[in-house]
Amino acid sequence: MEPQNTSTVTNFQLLGFQNLLEWQALLFVIFLLIYCLTIIGNVVIITVVSQGLRLHSPMYMFLQHLSFLEVWYTSTTVPLLLANLLSWGQAISFSACMAQLYFFVFLGATECFLLAFMAYDRYLAICSPLRYPFLMHRGLCARLVVVSWCTGVSTGFLPSLMISRLDFCGRNQINHFFCDLPPLMQLSCSRVYITEVTIFILSIAVLCICFFLTLGPYVFIVSSILRIPSTSGRRKTFSTCGSHLAVVTLYYGTMISMYVCPSPHLLPEINKIISVFYTVVTPLLNPVIYSLRNKDFKEAVRKVMRRKCGILWSTSKRKFLY
């Protein structure tokens, strides 16, 4: 009987998309472009909402926090993915891997709760417009935002702690582009049954409950839209809410398929593609869907741009004169 390699793993190697060697350069350009657009779009939202006088309603407070979250959420995984595409296999230390895992779970859970509260906010704004200022005031909005962040922070601790206590011996190659829960549990040489059950229950508690809390208000919104007598008003409102619902469904659908209902028959490469949707694609779509289709927000962007351009012009003119 051959002796088993029980040496403790101190670092991991992320394999990424090594089976697509001929597409590495193209994938790098695509992911880099998406990452840059995501950062720019969300930073624009944060800047415009903080400076726009008409954008201080609860809806835009939620949006500002969502954009701030998306910047960090996508930065947790994408830079390492880009480095992986350039080096064909990125090494990451054990502590850095656990840190990435924690921030991924923490920010992902926070986004779930934020999306649920934003759906409730949209429900009140559309279905109870006259009572909306009294029901969703800035104090309540601030408390809901704090609840989202605090719940996300606490949610990230348990999975990260349980994974960090597992033994990793011998193999250190993670068949993924970031330190995710399923591939780490597959790599461990410990018994992971309790860890799997705990993460499964936690995934149901966060993903499924938040999904139904997000979906519920949109059901009432759709029924309210169908009662709007104006065809143009109904079409415009339905288009906006339909876009929100499409992005929410994409985000939750891919997450649930990975953590609540994983298929043992799916190839690791398919799981990586599914992961791309909730780590790369949805952070890009959120600023487009929630803000750039909004008339008030686009007007605020134009005002901020005119103000910034005016300041730059006056500064350059003053330097030229002196």
From Swiss-Prot:
Pfam families: 7tm_4 (PF13853). Disulfide bonds join 97-189. Keywords: Cell membrane, Disulfide bond, G-protein coupled receptor, Glycoprotein, Membrane, Olfaction, Receptor, Sensory transduction, Transducer, Transmembrane, Transmembrane helix. The chain crosses the membrane at residues 26-46, 55-75, 100-120, 140-160, 198-217, 238-258, 272-292. Residues 47-54, 121-139, 218-237, 293-322 are cytoplasmic. SUPFAM superfamilies: Family A G protein-coupled receptor-like. PANTHER family: G-PROTEIN COUPLED RECEPTOR, OLFACTORY RECEPTOR. This is Olfactory receptor 11L1. It comes from Homo sapiens. The lineage of its organism: Eukaryota, Metazoa, Chordata, Craniata, Vertebrata. The gene is OR11L1.
